[in-house]
Amino acid sequence: MKLVLKEVKVYKYKCFLNEQKVAIDPKTTTIVGMNESGKTSFLSAIAKTNYFDDSDNDFKFDTTHDYPRNELIDFEEDDEDEGKIVSCTYVIPKELIEQINKELEVDVFNITEFTYNCNYRNSKITLSGIEADDRAFIEHLSKNYELSEPTKKVISELKSIDKVSELKAAEEDTDLSAFKAEIAKYANNPTGWNNLGHHIYITYIRPAMPKFWYFDDY
């Protein structure tokens, strides 16, 4: 099950000086336009968001080569400029959503689309719209463990799985250590974003994103 690219926004990239939004029809196979109209830049920008060959440095964003040249110096001196390059909005197929909830054994994810953002300031990708119901997931898993009523009450108020590690054991919390260990399997991101949404993205969404291939010789 692959995600479907729904929309692309190009902000500042090569010949693109102003934001351009393009809706992508699933049936589109060809982009037609006049010479120097931006077709090559548009397609290469999309390709660089998730190129099929991770080792190809020609398809990684580079400020010096990709930012519009006549605005590059101003950009480098303007710390308030966010440095947006391109945003791709994807549709998550119903079948994948059902698979996620089935494998997690509780209905915690119902997002149908999200946006994948690339930025000159930070090479890390940012995502908009990937959210899950951490509270429902925590409560669901906690039912399998011997825990005190006070601890169960605290658990019912937790909004993120990364907070489970902070729970303090009461005398009746026979299984708290085991519960923490189980939750830790889903909250193991050392870079910061450490909720159930991250686990779902890494485990299910990211592998389902289409890879892009760009070439200009034929």
Stretch-by-stretch model annotation:
Residues 1-51, 62-72:
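Pre-Walker A-like glycine/lysine-rich segment at the N-terminus of P-loop NTPase domains
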Residues 19, 28, 83-85, 212:
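A common structural microfeature
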Residues 20, 77, 204:
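Beta-strand elements of modular eukaryotic interaction domains
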Residues 35-38, 50-52, 58-60, 70-71, ...:
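Short, surface-exposed, polar/charged, turn-prone segments marking secondary-structure boundaries
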Residues 44-112:
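Conserved P-loop NTP-binding catalytic core
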Residues 85-218:
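Electropositive, glycine-dotted interaction segments
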